[in-house]
Amino acid sequence: MNQHDPLHTCKSCQNEFTGTFCNHCGEKILTPSDKSFKTILNNIILAFTLVDSRFVKTLWMVIKSPGALSRDFSNGKRVMQLSPTALFFVLNLIYFFFPVIQLFNASLNTQLMSPLRGFYSDLIAHKVVNMGVDLNSFTLLYNLKTTSLAKLMVMVFVVVSSLPLNFLYWKKNKYFMDHIGYAVELACFNLFINIIVLTMIMRLVGGGGYLDETALTVIFIVTNLYFVLRSSHTFYHEKGWRLLVKSITLILFLKVALEVYRAILFFITMASL
């Protein structure tokens, strides 16, 4: 250490030190250059660079080896990749800020194709009269509101979809939070494959007009069957005919969970208008 180095007082812990960083808490001396736009931009790029390798590695693990992330996280192997929850919030952030295919979102037209459409129609008619607007105006207001709410409520789907896991795999000695972690990984898979990637493909080929509710349901079933078959073997150690039967059963539960989530979204949207 140079004896001519100036003595600084740490802004965080009041420790006196020389150099750039506090030797007690690690706080950095703030200089005018640290407040420049260039430095701020460099710090943002650096932050993304440091996270990027783990993010890409974790995302690739979810796609290539479904269930491995949940297994490693449950077993305490957590340093080399992001946690399922951290990955979920990164993907949900992308989902929140960009216009994408509505899987977790559901327009008024989509809601009116649900098994509860008769009940929904009566509520909508009553709401339209109370608001004093026509159906077209109400549809516009509803769709704007439900889009923003849906992007905040994806975790509701995670919780709902985790409930059947406790029933299907109760002999596997898994904790409730293990099932939640698995459901979060499943949500990450759907956010990336069935929303982000599918949106990019449709934008490139211009086939968005063909993606009606039936097409989305088929894609949802096929992609999730791939995930569930692979992940149930990896995470729950299922195999043979039990793996197939439980995977198909879980797909049915996931479709029900999606409808339950959309029903919750409908009632919250209606209440907020």
Residue ranges and their predicted role:
Residues 1-273:
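Membrane-proximal intrinsically disordered regions of secretory-pathway and membrane-system proteins
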